[in-house]
Amino acid sequence: MNVFKNFEKKIKKSLESSDIKGKNGEDLDLSKITVDPPRDSSHGHLSTNAAMVLAKSTGLNPRALAEKIIELLKNDPSVESINVAGPGFINIKLTKPFWQDLIKSMLEKGISYGRIPMGQGKRINVEYVSANPTGPMHVGHCRGAVVGDVLSNLLQFVGYNITKEYYINDAGKQIEVLAHSVLLRYREALGQKINEIPEGLYPGEYLIPLGQSLAQEFGDKLLTIDKEEALSIVKERAIHEMMSMIRKDLAALNIYHDIFFSERMLYADNARAIRNTINDLTLKGYIYKGKLPPPKGQNTEDWEPCEQTLFRSTDVGDDQDRVLIKSDGSYTYFAADVAYFRDKFNRHFDEMIYILGADHAGYVKRLEAMAKAISNDKAKLSVFLCQLVKLFRNGHPVRMSKRAGSFVTLRDVVEEVGSDPVRFMMLYRKCEAPLDFDFAKVTEQSKDNPIFYVQYASARCHSVFRQAQETLCIENISNDKIIEHLNRLTDDNEIFLIRKLSEYPRIIEQAVVHKEPHRLAFYLYDLASSFHTHWNKGSDNLNLRFIQPDDRNLSFARLGLIQAIMNILSSGLAIVGIKAATEMR
């Protein structure tokens, strides 16, 4: 139950059946009415902008209109008090029985509380990570990996049918570079001296085992056979080994994709998928032969001062037309990307989401353009860019990894601090904002470490149940016993916690609508903080402690509050991909 949405519907229904109309007697547009938690919790439990957004169309002063709306709502049995604030906001305080009934509903739903049926089985493809198979994943990939995975979990939670997809860029020049880099390590394994790694090749030590493996299997055969044949063998082995490494890196972060789509599939059968895509766009009038002007202030490999096959992407919102076939007949990277999108579209997804690095910002318009052209503007496409992650240790920048060659690997980070802190902290900023990740901060046991603070709240909740079993001499505490006494939850601090719990469905809905999984991480920390504040009050006021040995019924009621907190922490953390702690060690 979304308290805020329900009350919004209640306000709209009351207005529809009232005599409050537009200036000319017309029905009002109620679509902009919202109900939210007030910024200052002391002002009430709910706040609505109804009078503010309707004042102009009714011709009434916002405060005067607010008074009329209050008359419609004041006799609602769930309303304890209602008043106008500031320029015309309406603040509402709900009765304690309302909150007691709500926590009963939370407990009955268990960890399904907040699972709003928004998706209705619609199919969404979420493509994320898609790192080049040229080495281990670095920390730059980590943020997009977590954001994509948690967004997928979030959408799945509310009823969407999600496909998690990884696009393997295994047909470009970087694979040629990888193969030559591996051949160098192969020669090294055979005893040849290679000195410094030539510029342009991958210098990381992660390729040494692959070179040794090839030396054991082939001896010096790869140096004596046809160079192209040797290169082909090495490419296959290198791609397989790099993708195996990447899969293990992702698994260390608890990330598992449903589909790994190889770019080489698009080039199979003489690039049939790409040819069909270009033919399709030709029939729609988007393909022509022409010359592009040179790019201003930069060089791109696709630009040539001669005629090429171009995609008229400016007709569908792009800044410039794009090259699909170069003058030598070879396809551009973008041609494969268009064919890949067409493949996705033909798999009948209702929406396609791309999670990309910030360095792909210039790619967004061409993605949107190709989607419009391929689908006749029917495809729903969303692109999200993840900003950089900077690593620190006690405030000092972290050195690069020798094993990787020029970057810190994802595995290095996960092995040092664990996957849970990495996942949570990668969500603890909006993805479009840069993120500083400090190894010292994410391992300290304090409220300044968000994942610790959230897990500490979960562990404390479990400890209350263990204490209750000992103090109240009850082995199993049933939901029925708890629900029977929820009317004992009357303290303002308890009501405040129930109010905080009631925000969970709203947070889920907003995170889904805006596709912003960081909202969930913020909420979990906020809930944990509210719980810890209440816990600490029990140190000064024994009457606020959850277990009251002399009042079993009140203890049962408060255990209901604890159970509801445990459920939401467990539910929210599961979406983030983290198991809620039962104790801290």
UniProtKB/Swiss-Prot annotation:
Belongs to the class-I aminoacyl-tRNA synthetase family. The gene is argS. The keyword S-adenosyl-L-methionine does not apply. Its main location: cytoplasm. SUPFAM superfamilies: Anticodon-binding domain of a subclass of class I aminoacyl-tRNA synthetases, Arginyl-tRNA synthetase (ArgRS), N-terminal 'additional' domain, Nucleotidylyl transferase. This is Arginine--tRNA ligase. The keyword Protein biosynthesis applies. InterPro entries: aa-tRNA-synth_I_CS, Arg-tRNA-ligase, Arg-tRNA-synth_N, Arg-tRNA-synth_N_sf, ArgRS_core, DALR_anticod-bd, Rossmann-like_a/b/a_fold, tRNAsynth_Ia_anticodon-bd. One of its GO terms (molecular function) is ATP binding. Its EC number is 6.1.1.19. One of its GO terms (biological process) is arginyl-tRNA aminoacylation. A motif ('HIGH' region) lies at residues 131-141. Keywords: Aminoacyl-tRNA synthetase, ATP-binding, Cytoplasm, Ligase, Nucleotide-binding, Protein biosynthesis. GO terms for cellular component: cytoplasm. It comes from the Bacteria. It is found in: Cytoplasm. Monomer. PROSITE patterns: AA_TRNA_LIGASE_I. It catalyses: tRNA(Arg) + L-arginine + ATP = L-arginyl-tRNA(Arg) + AMP + diphosphate.
